[in-house]
Amino acid sequence: MHNSEATETIYKEIYQLEPAHYMVITKNNIVKNKYWNPLKDVKPLKLKNHDEYVKRFLEIFEEAVKCRLRTVGQVGIMVSGGLDSGSIAAIASKELKKEEKVLKGYSFLPIESYSNKIVNHRIADESEYVNILKNYCGNLDITYCRNDNINSLTNIDELIGIFEQPIKTLENSYWVTGMAKQSSEDGVKVLLIGQNGNVSISFGDFFIHIQTLIRQLKFGEVISEVNAANKRYGKPKKAIYSTIISNAIPYKIKKIRHRKEDTIENKFEDSVIKLDLIKKYNVEERFDKKGYNSVITKVGTLKETRKSILDEATLAHIGIMETKDSLAYGIIKRDPSKDKRIMEFCLSIPSEAYVHEGEERYLIRSSMVGILPEEIRTNWRNRGIQSADWVERLLPDWDKTKNQVKEALMDNEVKKYVDIEKVEGLLEKYDDISNCQNRNEVKLILIPLVFYKFIKQYREMLDFQYDI
């Protein structure tokens, strides 16, 4: 997130229109209206059985994919070994085959020296599953993007220019833009993505489902779901119930119990902004209102979760980044999992359509029978993780990077915003990052450097304007 409010930008007195709004400007006034409000307008959908939900979902999903394939050029997709991009790829490749076109897939690979292939059921190298998908679809051409000799800072000046602001998502910068560039060079005009899938087509969190059942007083179903999850995943019932009880404690009580930990210092531990600025601009209060940076775990019901899914600041951030990325590389990113019809359907169905007999992401898994290979559809244990090697990529140039950070910390503008002492402490701690234990702290070291690079670009732009 680069902004906490949907209308904010980093530029003083420059604002942006919120998602799902339109503005009419006349010489007399400015009128702004919200034209899409699904939490208010979308009614609950109750069908006879799960098969009916699957049938309705597939009708909408297939059309959402199909209508995004229109282009005079090639169609590509950012594909992993997971459910979201895999489902989109399976349907898109089938449709393109009718037009005698091939779907061009682009998949991330970590550098060859990266050794942690699977950590805590997260897979860094998903090529095994991507190859399974490729062979199953038969109309999917895969280009693996390892992006050797590229790290999070290599193209950072270019990215700052594209996005017109400092880049916070450093971990993803080198492979996301790398794929966009490669696909553009290959003649791709439409690049499919499945970024929104986790909150739409493949939504389905076990503990959110349990919270929903508890709120509905369906305790018998809670017991059944716990028993099923125990059998499916092998997790002890005691551990499952312990988490359920912890989640069920009202948030206000949790705040009282953990008031010593619920401090501004802890909330902004993962930030290098000066605390006095955070206080000056009421950032803590604004974040609390939106549920950002909470040190206390809060698991809501499905209804409560849907409010956060439609957070306007988040949607604005995603939309702006995708649009500017697309404009820079001459492609159009299209996300079928963010289709308006898909979102409305997914916001209308009951919790049991998403989680069933302990199985998470049940809607997409049950809908993709015969469409996705079973190795992907029934992969309950492992999930992919992109950018797993981002710190390792920094190693060859780390000494140079540290010197650049030190230079940034000397800049007067940077000093106004950044907690210099905190960053200097992290620099001392991570003089060597070969055995890094906390990757987020390495990211905190880099953020002042990225900010400094933005400031330098801004100064150069002003100097150019004055010269003219």
Each language-model region and where it sits:
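Cysteine-centered catalytic environments shared across enzyme families
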Residues: 1-148, 155-162, 177, 449
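Adenosyl-5′-phosphate
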Residues: 12-19, 29-30, 187-188, 247, ...
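Short acidic-aromatic active-site loops that bind/stabilize oxyanions
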Residues: 47-58, 165-169, 304-309, 332
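Active-site catalytic microenvironments for nucleophilic, acid-base chemistry
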Residues: 67, 91-98, 182, 186, ...
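Short, solvent-exposed loop/turn segments at secondary-structure junctions
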Residues: 83-85, 110-113, 148-152, 196-200, ...
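Short secondary-structure boundary/capping segments
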Residues: 120-123, 159-162, 204-215, 463-467
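Mobile, glycine- and charge-enriched loop segments
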Residues: 149-173, 177, 265-288
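Active-site adenylate/phosphate-handling loop in enzymes that bind or generate adenylated species
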Residues: 169-170, 177-253, 318-342
